[in-house]
């Protein structure tokens, strides 16, 4: 008996070692994530109604108990980005001190903007301002001047500084640890200062990376679902193609073939080219809207709404509607913040990948300030285009969010042309977002490899499209929103820890240490010595210029 016991103990130890090795092997991040997504797809396929019930319970629990956390954490991140941009940390370069950017400013902006917003701008550009115009909260009269102010103020809030700050913070952290500290290009790298040397460091990092992969797939699948719904609506409006699940599956299928083919190529050939094309088409459509729409009105709205937004920045950032209906908050602000958080692993990883060599200040201006201004102009133009048609028209248009854009275009000259351009733009954004996500998913499931295996990119490309189809068939627009909120919650809880970890490293950065040492040396110097030093620096600059 004792021998058998010893053998059993030996077997148990071996099993434990095997399980630990399984967790520590880099490739098993891919297998574990694959298994979880496959299970979710199977559950949706076998029992849609039960899946819908479970997700509703989870959604209500998150909104009721933790809704305020979304607002506080996202505002905190926006303030952190502002501080980093304005402080001495802003001079730190994402890479070695002599690193140079790999991409031109135009290509860099095109890629980060296409990855960060994409389909959402086209989907909600008209629909959101019109919805808030018709259904404002806080006792504001529907269709009034106050409702117009509320509509644009809220749209700016949902698509401006806050979402881009979320992207910027995570991308900044990843780029800093990857290119300056030599860490892997993974979300878990942001936790290195905290977890380094701890007993379960590798296991905890693996769990974080699996959560990041799940959030990315769900977040992108949600956006692909929105894109398919609106492309289908546009084709139905222009060509009377049936607006149903079959058409949406075909659209997703065709787009999947294109973006997977693109993702299997190089970053420069695929995503960069598509991103530049996106920006060109976007500005073309924006230009047409401004010229054919109420041009002066659009610029007046932009100016006034920007002032209102900045004036009420803190107030709207923490608006919870404490004693009112929480439905509005969950359907709009919390949905958006969840969607942005769910997208951060993908967008953050991608932006980090293309931002090597830029300073922190340059990075934040490029990733937060400029895209926010473009979003403000976009919503001013498209929102004014819709609201100018009046409250009664808006009520009809927003009955189906995905068709609102095409109904509004139909009321203006060259409406069919604008609708056609919008469909092309939707498809292009659709492809670019999925293309970028496929690359990042391959990278995250390959231990941060900047050139992940093609078979992984192929599998993730197909899986995110299958999940989009499953969510649409399970509950359409509502299910897409619900899935995004639920999957983003674990990541939301991790964000404050990431803030602490980043500042912990920044304070110990060699660049900051050198600057502090120099300041201390200057403090010890006399005024004459400082004057002499200043003259010497000027002479050196003149010599360098000559």
What are these regions (language model features)?
Residues 2-147, 264, 287, 500-508, ...:
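N-terminal alpha-helical transmembrane segments of multi-pass membrane transport
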